[in-house]
Regions:
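Short beta-strand segments within Ig-like beta-sandwich modules, predominantly Fibronectin type-III
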Residues: 403-409
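Pro/Thr/Ser/Gly-rich low-complexity, intrinsically disordered linker/stalk tracts
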Residues: 362-391, 419, 434-448
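Substrate-binding cleft of secreted/luminal carbohydrate-active enzymes
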Residues: 44, 267-361
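Beta-strand-rich modules
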Residues: 414-433
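Chitinase-like catalytic core of GlcNAc-active glycosidases
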Residues: 30-252, 256, 276-280, 285-299, ...
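Short beta-strand elements bearing conserved aromatic residues within extracellular beta-rich modules
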Residues: 396-398, 474
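Tryptophan-rich substrate-binding surfaces of secreted polymer-degrading and adhesive proteins
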Residues: 422, 442-499
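Sec-dependent signal peptide cleavage junction
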Residues: 20-31
Length: 499
């Protein structure tokens, strides 16, 4: 996302203080009538698009991403101050927007923003500075828009178990911030396509480099809006290359996140799909907002949305894997609110009206039976279960050893088990019409006492536990719950080598 700075001197503005005490509402419970959202970036600088005070942003927007929080000399500590108005006025503006159902999110990075987290000290500085800024101004969440410094190191080959310190520490830091604020905290991401969909053709350098971040934070992620611009073209699930700024491109790139894909073409290494409501498309508000291309006319984009959400074809080359579409797809993001205002509000007016008139297609059939049910014994006490998405499903039930658990996440972690015990699993899909039949059952056995477990993240290890990491055995010397970045090789206070 491009920006050119021109410093603006603070101006004196007045806002009634009562707004500071109005309640904050849910992120999707604003003044607009649809559950679809419009997310826009707001410039904390002047690049010739005009100055808009935060409180004067159009009510057509549901989420306002403030661009940008940026790092200071250590490249880890984040700073932010409003270039327009005073600190107090900015706080009051956020409080006012919250009072009318909007969310205001601090975006970090941008085209020129660099955040580097090579070690624990840098990670701590990042976490502390972010929490300080969020508390100071009352931000409702954070947006990760890092376009520099996110590159995989040479031996980092598994997106599920990353080794790149920058990525490992970023995941751990963002998770800590989200945990600090709880489930209503907004977490969004705005990577370029090379960092996400690019992982379909290669996993090295910046290609696919966001996949471990998305995977490591998918349980915290509110939504992701990949930038479908300044990209040229990308390869889709059908193996064809599509050009930015076309309906085919918008649909194809979005479905990669909705269906999942083999990383670097490896069918044994699948990036599993995100939930429909976690997927948003990022677009430029006008041609000038994306100098390297990607603008699409609203009339053409609406064809793409009709196909993506309703399954109504427009005669394009790309064919949806799920021909019925994805009605819970969440919405659109744009760079930027300021560019939209400069272009006579074409973006916000066109898409707000479209989304407000969107009606979920009626559900008339039960969902299909889930297929691809598989399980893996992670340890002596944990089995992970996953399955393919079922057509028409809005949720899933899991039958574990004959007991039904409703509305489970995919993948599902079955924990607190005993070693060498076998467990049975079946899954069914659910929607408003009813339930599918149960899938075929699978049997999975936990690891035995004699097995040396591979180290994993988010597992409770007790003093004396033995794990294997990169072919070396380690003994736990301090009870803890593991996190990405706390691998035995990195934490001598928690682990010691053993035979």
């Amino acid at each position: 996302m491009k920006k050119v700075f021109k410093r603006i001197f603070p101006i004196s503005l007045v806002l009634v203080m009562v707004f500071l005490f109005m309640p904050i509402t849910n992120v999707f419970a604003g003044s607009n009538s649809s559950d679809k959202i419009l997310v826009g970036y707001w410039h904390n600088f002047d690049n010739g698009t005009g100055i808009i005070r935060l409180k004067d942003v159009s009510t057509k927007w549901d989420v306002i991403n403030v661009a940008f929080g940026e790092s200071i000399g250590d490249r880890a500590t984040i700073k932010f101050s409003p270039e327009i108005g005073t600190d107090q006025e900015f706080k009051e503006d956020i409080a006012y927007l919250n009072s009318i159902g909007k969310k205001v999110v601090l975006s970090i990075g941008g085209q020129n923003g660099v955040v580097l987290l090579p070690d624990e000290n840098a990670k701590k500085n990042f976490i502390d500075s972010m929490i300080s800024l969020i508390d100071k101004y009352g931000f409702n969440g954070i947006d990760i828009d890092l376009e520099s410094g996110i590159n995989l190191i040479n031996n980092d080959k598994d997106f599920k178990n990353p080794k790149t310190p920058q990525i490992v520490n970023l995941i751990s830091a963002v998770r800590a911030i989200c945990d600090h604020y709880g489930p209503d905290f907004v977490l969004s991401m705005a990577p370029e396509t090379a960092y996400v969909q690019g992982g379909y053709v290669a996993y090295a350098g910046n290609w696919g480099a966001y996949l471990p971040i998305i995977h490591g934070l998918r349980d915290k992620l509110t939504y992701i809006h990949v930038q479908h611009y300044n990209a040229g073209g990308n390869t889709a699930l059908d193996g064809n290359n599509y050009t930015q700024g076309t309906a085919d491109y918008e649909v194809a790139m979005a479905e990669m996140l909705l269906q999942g894909f083999p990383v670097a073409g490896n069918a044994d290494n699948i990036f599993t799909p995100l939930k429909q409501e976690q997927v948003v498309i990022g677009l430029p508000a006008c041609p000038s907002a994306a100098p390297s291309g990607g603008y699409i006319k609203p009339s053409e984009m609406k064809k793409a949305l009709d196909y993506l959400m309703r399954g109504i074809p427009y005669g394009g080359k790309y064919k949806l894997v799920n021909s019925n579409g994805y009605p819970a797809f969440k919405g659109l993001m744009t760079w930027s609110i300021n560019w939209d205002a400069k272009s006579n509000y074409e973006f916000s007016t066109s898409y707000r009206e479209y989304f407000d008139n969107f009606k979920q297609p009626p559900v008339t059939e039960k969902p299909s039976i889930p297929i691809g049910l598989k399980g893996e014994a992670i340890s002596k006490t944990q089995i992970n279960i996953a399955w393919n998405l079922a057509h028409g499903a809005t949720s899933y039930d899991l039958k574990v050893d004959g007991n039904i658990i409703n509305n489970v996440n995919n993948p599902y972690k079955h924990i607190n088990l005993k070693p060498s015990f076998m467990h049975s699993y079946e899954v069914r899909a659910v929607n408003s019409v009813g339930n599918s039949e149960w899938s075929k059952a699978i049997i999975v056995q936990t690891k035995s006492e004699s097995d040396v477990e591979k180290w994993g993240a988010n597992i409770l290890y007790k003093a004396g536990d033995i794990v294997s990491y990169e072919g070396i055995n380690y003994r736990c010397i301090q009870t803890h719950t593991s996190l990405i970045g706390w691998e035995p090789i990195n934490t001598p206070t928690l682990w010691e080598k053993t035979n």
